Each structure stands twice: as C-alpha cells, then as structure tokens.
Amino acid sequence: MTMIQFNSYHQKVEIKRNLELMNLEHKKIREYVNFDVCSFEQLDEFQVGYSIDTDGNSLVTDEEDTWDANWIVIAYETMCGDPIIIDLSEEGYPISSLMHGMDSWSGGDFLADSMESFINFMKDIGDFLTEKQVLEGKRMILTKELDILLNEFLERNKFTDFEIWLSLLSPLFDIAEEYEQTMERKVKKMKEEGKKITEIAHMLNIKPKEVYEYIKKV
C-alpha cells in the first residue's frame, strides 16, 4: 500500500490506471527514449530523496523553491537522473521534468499538459516506430519525420519545451542522423559515378526529390 496521500480514492485509482497505461506504452518504445517510468507499486520508492527521506520522513517544507507536497515522481530521465513528476493539484495531472540545483527545485521543463496527453504521445511514437518498421530492425527514418511527430505534439501542448523533448528522444534522432549521413555518402558516390537522379532514386528506393536534397547537402 502506497504512503502517498492522494486527494481521494478516485484520484488514486486514476493515477494507478494512468501509470499502467504509461508503462504499457513505454515498454514498446523504451529503447528509443531517454526516460524510464515507475509502476504504481514503485511510487513510494521513487519519492525517496524528494518528498521523503530513506526512513519515510517528510522532506516537504514551507520554504520557497522547495519540494511541493503535490509533486509525485513517476519517472526519471535516464541521462542525468532528473525526476519527472505529476502535479496532483492540477487538472489532468500535468507532467514536468525538474532539475535540482543550489538547494532549489525552481528549475525545470514542462513536458505535457496531462498524463493522458503524455500517454497518447508515447502511443504516437510507438505507432511511428511500427509504421517505419524500426521495431523490426529497419533504421530508415528522417529527422524531418521526427520533427513533424514532435511538433504535432507541441501544438497540442502549448507550453511544452522543444529542447527537452529533443533530449528525451535523442536515441531516435541519432538513428535518423546516422541514416541520413549514410544516404548522403551513397548519393555522393553514385553522383560521382555519373548516375542520374532518377537512377539513384530507383537504386536507393527513395523519391527523386529526396535524392536532390541529399545532393544539395553534399
């Protein structure tokens, strides 16, 4: 049984359901994102060092820029370990990434306006990976495709920071960059061999417009 003081039984059930959905979607994309999500059963463990100490004593105070009693850690960034939280006092439980510095929790980035929106974005990422057959081992994705995916999410979450999501999705952007660099080398070699744009497009199974774009880069 969790030690977290939810505002109601309904809220507890809602958070539990959302975390189950979040873990379900995260499992599909875990290899391609820089964050991990806790289960409902792990919630108490994830609060240690933030709202409680190792003995379960509260670390919440009334001092400015300290930990808020309504903040619940549900995940963390895998690159630097920063906590990802929900705010129990806000409708939909908006999600943010916090950064601790100089004994203050005043810094951080907004990730999604609700748990539902966060879950839906993970679904979108999973659908994208399925469509592009990345989960089957193909690594043929473009940076502009990821930009479109991310910007569509940002349109629905107006206060979300692009840079923080760029960091959280860097494994995917790295795959795209590696693929594009490989294609640039192939296009350059074929062009030097005297092949026409239409020939290169046919041989690489891409559109002539894409070949032209690679030629402009090299």
PLM regions: where:
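Compact, glycine/acidic-enriched structural inserts
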Residues: 94-133
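Short, hydrophobic/amphipathic alpha-helical patches that form generic packing surfaces
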Residues: 76, 82, 116-124, 189
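A surface-exposed partner-binding patch
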Residues: 1-90, 192-193, 197-203, 207-209, ...
